[in-house]
Amino acid sequence: MLQIQKITKEYITGDLHQIALNGISLNLRDNEFVAILGPSGSGKTTLLNIIGGLDRYDSGDLIINGISTKRYKDRDWDSYRNHTIGFVFQSYNLIPHQTVLANVELALTISGISKNERRKRAIDALKEVGLGEHLHKRPNQMSGGQMQRVAIARALVNDPDILLADEPTGALDSETSVQVMELLKEVARDRLVVMVT
């Protein structure tokens, strides 16, 4: 499904040249749970951002379902992100004044789906992560683990082929971290999950 071939990424700031990725190659299959481990500053998030189309690689190739991304234009990357990728971030990135349901629905607003269908899909996604009873709460009324579950529901509501999780348990206690990891393993039954930690 996803092939990373000799990907290189360098950040240049003035005279400073920082090589974040140097010839990285990986093959990732459907329905797989992959954890990428490494110390801070080792390029894990850069790799995740390249897989997710949030950042561009300098050389090498990212091959998606047998198709090279070397000639992708901005609209191709936009389509890839909107239809193929779900993102889960350590900081949740929830809108504090919106309900949990509205936060999840937001991921569907540019998809052209009717309001009723958006609501149904958002409710289903929240039920899938065990938050069906918390639809009308706001993020500040929830625990860290619950907010991460909302973020996972939001990432899943578009039914992406790939879920990317950037340190999803970094801000959680150990018991809640285990629960979130179990949820991500469950999610990997139906799609590729790539997590960095």
Task: Mark where each language-model region is.
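ABC family nucleotide-binding domain
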Residues: L2-T197
